[in-house]
Regions:
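Short S/T/G/P-rich N-terminal loop/turn motif that feeds into the first structured element of a domain
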Residues: 1-74, 78-85, 112-116
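"Short basic amphipathic alpha-helical interaction patches in structured regions
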Residues: 87-89
Length: 116
């Protein structure tokens, strides 16, 4: 179920969490190309105040754990307005151009602080 909330005036931190499933996760050429593209995004994007990039952790199997994704990328923005700017930023668009052909699925979870 999708919950839509009016967050236009949100001023607190905005967390943008992105999960990627690569088409060929065992193909070294593909994983290297994806990692190169996302690392370029991390290095060059001016909007994020913090970043985290990694692979699915190999943890014990539990019903609540989904580690089927190939890569995870999280960016923290100062607010919603900054995240909106990121969506049209040339660094983000270049990443999509360079890497979109490598993934078969992407899921984004965005969150805002309830304390704002």
């Amino acid at each position: 179920m999708m919950i839509k909330k009016n967050i236009e005036n949100t001023t607190g931190p905005f967390v943008h969490s992105v999960y990627f499933w690569l088409k060929n996760p065992d193909n070294l050429e593909n994983t290297n190309a994806f990692e190169k593209a996302i690392r370029k995004l991390i290095r060059t994007n001016p909007q994020a105040t913090s970043n985290h990039f990694g692979k699915a952790a190999e943890v014990e199997e539990r019903a609540v754990v989904d580690n089927s994704f190939t890569y995870f990328y999280m960016m923290i923005f100062s607010d919603l307005k900054t995240q909106n700017t990121y969506q049209t930023d040339p660094t983000h668009k270049l990443f999509i151009k360079e890497a979109a052909h490598l993934w078969e699925r992407v899921i984004v979870y965005d969150s805002i602080s309830e304390n704002t």
